[in-house]
Amino acid sequence: MIRAGLRWLLAVFYFIAGVAHLCSPMGFLAITPVWVPFPPEVVAFTGVAEILGAIGLVIPRTWIGWARPAAGIGLALYALFVWPANFNHAFNNIPLGGVAASWWYHGPRLLAQPLIIWLALWAGEATHWPFRSKS
């Protein structure tokens, strides 16, 4: 019950974030590190990845058994790969919408990323750790 609720919450969050990446990419482009090639395309790709991952999380296992774990793994990798943008945002104090966030935002946000990675794996049923073994 808790896993299903968090799965839906995560799916809604990622779906909205994916749409935001596609409809309003400027904020995401602003925090993209300079070493990322083709930033507009990468931001668009990440938006599509978030939307597809969100959909994959809520596909019933009886329809496509591998979709949910694959979506969880994909969203976990996504969260890992966009982490540098969060560091870039924090350490370069990049304002979004004319407002610079303080470390009261950046600190917890950076520390939460491993939890977000685990949550994607757990909600997607790619792992059962630490609650029970997969057997």
Feature locations, PLM:
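Membrane-interface extramembranous regions
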Residues: M1-S135
